[in-house]
């Protein structure tokens, strides 16, 4: 039974019914519809904290989905799971795949920067200043791209870029 048929929450059930109706009415092929069902079930599992099931559904969705924007969104969600599980290298690789599919995903860049910045802080705490600077520079690089894609959307990142002297003036205009 698809996960979408097991929702206990009234709002989730209502959303699922509406989404199913919209998908049935849209002029898209059966493969894309099936990919969406897997994606939706993956999202539901992810929201419930069932990451293994979410990843299984996302993998199935990727096998069927041809639209690069939708593939990018699916990959981004997978990367979020890897990141929350502490699989930083896998998360970074998956965020990059998501950006390869759809380069206009500032949240992927933001999250990549979070990993780089965390690694920089760890290196700094361990007294590895050169390594820390390298990680911070990588964070600045991806965060600058994120801010360019979403000006004003990441004020905390803009402040970090300014306070660390890693900002580019053109980012903010």
Swiss-Prot record:
<feature type="repeat" description="TPR 3">
    <location>
        <begin position="120"/>
        <end position="153"/>
    </location>
</feature>
<dbReference type="InterPro" id="IPR019734">
    <property type="entry name" value="TPR_rpt"/>
</dbReference>
<comment type="function">
    <text>Essential for the assembly of the photosystem I (PSI) complex. May act as a chaperone-like factor to guide the assembly of the PSI subunits.</text>
</comment>
<keyword id="KW-0793">Thylakoid</keyword>
<comment type="similarity">
    <text>Belongs to the Ycf3 family.</text>
</comment>
<dbReference type="InterPro" id="IPR051685">
    <property type="entry name" value="Ycf3/AcsC/BcsC/TPR_MFPF"/>
</dbReference>
<keyword id="KW-0472">Membrane</keyword>
<dbReference type="InterPro" id="IPR011990">
    <property type="entry name" value="TPR-like_helical_dom_sf"/>
</dbReference>
<keyword id="KW-0602">Photosynthesis</keyword>
<dbReference type="InterPro" id="IPR022818">
    <property type="entry name" value="PSI_Ycf3_assembly"/>
</dbReference>
<dbReference type="Pfam" id="PF14559">
    <property type="entry name" value="TPR_19"/>
</dbReference>
<feature type="repeat" description="TPR 2">
    <location>
        <begin position="72"/>
        <end position="105"/>
    </location>
</feature>
<dbReference type="GO" id="GO:0015979">
    <property type="term" value="P:photosynthesis"/>
</dbReference>
<dbReference type="GO" id="GO:0031676">
    <property type="term" value="C:plasma membrane-derived thylakoid membrane"/>
</dbReference>
<feature type="repeat" description="TPR 1">
    <location>
        <begin position="35"/>
        <end position="68"/>
    </location>
</feature>
<protein>
    <recommendedName>
        <fullName>Photosystem I assembly protein Ycf3</fullName>
    </recommendedName>
</protein>
<keyword id="KW-0802">TPR repeat</keyword>
<keyword id="KW-0677">Repeat</keyword>
